[in-house]
Regions:
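An N-terminal amphipathic alpha-helical segment
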Residues: 381-420
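Ser/Thr-centric signal marking residues that sit
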Residues: 289, 412, 436
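Membrane-interfacial helix-loop segments of redox and metal-homeostasis proteins
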Residues: 1-355, 360-363, 368-372, 376
């Protein structure tokens, strides 16, 4: 559970969302976030190659079932757009208090359990009958995994350095806030997630579970344990995912970001459909964006890389169908100054010189519950003014509280692209104080 809690903290503070990373490539033409995902794979690959070479672990390589992996990956990619996040993202967003993610998580675990050991297991097994027997690229070529791990790590380091150099050359705006409320750089988060993945394998193997990080099977086991009470389902993997929930809750609570947010009926239905699709797709593909995307890819297995390719395709189709960016309102007037805190942005007080907007995030004051009808953030949500509002003196505020990944990132990136040089954008996602230029 300690490894899971650490993962939950890092993912929550780093906003580590594979759905958003893939979506950015297609909608924003941005690969910066995806590099963080490659960093996870690179660190993981080096670490697992080292542990295998030293005889600390003995990975059991999965054989490649093309139809199941391709179809499952595509379904999973579509589903994580509807659910508002990938498997690990849904776990850590649940820890932030997002009720829509709770729905997605529940049906993700139930559908995965049905696919693995329930009434859908026959369907799952049937699609996996076509099995090539192929395992990994290194085994096919008869070479060490180091021949893949080192070049991949070097290429990732080179690309990351290029992005960091570009970022360093741009003017920055800093926020005066305590260290525990500051976000974690995605590249730092990626490196830590990779290290935790390396640590996870020997710890898991010591309990008899010869595997590393994983979300789908542990989620299925957790639901099976809850419904049957059988102790065999309570294992290292189930404690891992519970730890993610605990860690993300602690991180969100300390940073002032935890808040119960309740989606409307339509959004809830989408989250449920997305959760079911995640469980079905991940079970067919043999893993999610963690099991396939972070573990199997680092072993350079056919299953891992083909699954990720079809997950990306599913995200591309889903993003084109359901996601819509919005940004700064062109020609917005600049009124008097003032800064919202997170609490103020929820209750929507009127700023001096700024007209209040109609918000879909409403707070029940007695119970600290927020009703967010745009929880998943799909294009078909009811119309609202999601543009950044002027605060005066070249500052704007964008209210994203109540939206699930990846919608806040879409709005923020679009808004930033429309700012003039020297202007500032404040996101009402966390408790912040007066921003300062640097």
């Amino acid at each position: 559970m300690a490894v899971g809690a650490a993962l939950g903290i890092v993912m929550q503070r780093g906003r580590f969302c594979v759905t958003g990373m893939l979506r950015d490539v297609f909608l924003q033409k941005q690969g910066r976030g995806l590099v963080a995902f490659f960093i996870v794979i690179a660190v993981h690959a080096i670490g697992l190659a080292a542990l295998t070479s030293l005889g600390v672990i003995s990975p059991e390589y999965r054989t490649f079932a093309p139809l199941a992996v391709a179809l499952g990956g595509f379904i999973f990619g579509l589903a994580i757009i509807l659910a508002g996040g990938c498997a690990s993202g849904t776990w850590y967003r649940s820890g932030e208090g997002l009720v829509g993610s709770w729905f997605a998580l529940l049906f993700y675990g139930l559908s995965a359990a049905a696919m693995k050991s329930g009434f859908l297991s026959g369907f799952n097994d049937k699609l996996k009958e076509w099995d090539t027997g192929w395992t990994t690229l290194p085994q096919t070529l008869g070479v060490s995994a180091w021949w893949f791990a080192i070049p991949f790590a070097l290429a990732t380091a080179f690309i990351a350095q290029r992005y960091l150099a570009r970022d360093a050359a741009k003017p920055k705006v800093t926020l005066e806030q305590p260290w525990y409320r500051k976000p974690l750089h995605p590249y730092t988060a990626g490196a830590v997630v990779g290290l935790l993945g390396v640590l996870a394998w020997p710890l898991s193997a010591a309990t008899g579970r010869n595997d590393g990080l994983g979300i789908t099977t542990p989620s299925a086991h957790l639901m099976s344990y809850i419904t049957t009470g059988e102790g065999r389902f309570l294992n290292w993997g189930t404690l891992l995912v519970l730890g993610i929930l605990v860690g993300s809750y602690i991180a969100a609570k300390v940073a002032g970001e935890f808040r119960i947010r309740v989606p409307d009926g339509r959004t809830s239905v989408r989250a449920i459909i997305g959760g079911i699709g995640m469980g079905v797709g991940a079970s067919l593909a043999g893993g999610c964006t963690v099991g396939n995307g972070m573990v199997q890819t680092s072993l350079f297995s056919y299953q891992g890389w083909v699954a990720m390719a079809f997950i990306a395709l599913g995200v591309f189709v889903g993003a084109k169908l359901w996601l819509k960016p919005s940004g700064v309102k062109q020609g917005a007037a600049k009124g008097a100054g003032g800064v919202y805190t997170t609490d103020e942005s929820i209750s929507e007080p009127q700023l001096a010189g700024v007209e209040p907007r109609q918000s879909e995030v409403e707070e029940a004051p007695k119970f600290n519950i927020v009703s967010a009808s745009s929880g998943v953030g799909l294009k078909t949500k009811p119309k609202q003014d999601t543009t950044a509002r002027p605060l005066g003196e070249g500052r704007y505020i964008l209210d994203t509280l109540g939206d699930v990944c990846p919608f806040p990132l879409i709005e923020a990136k679009q808004a930033m692209s429309e700012l003039n040089s020297g202007e500032e954008l404040i996101l009402s996602l966390i408790h912040i104080s007066e921003p300062t230029r640097r």
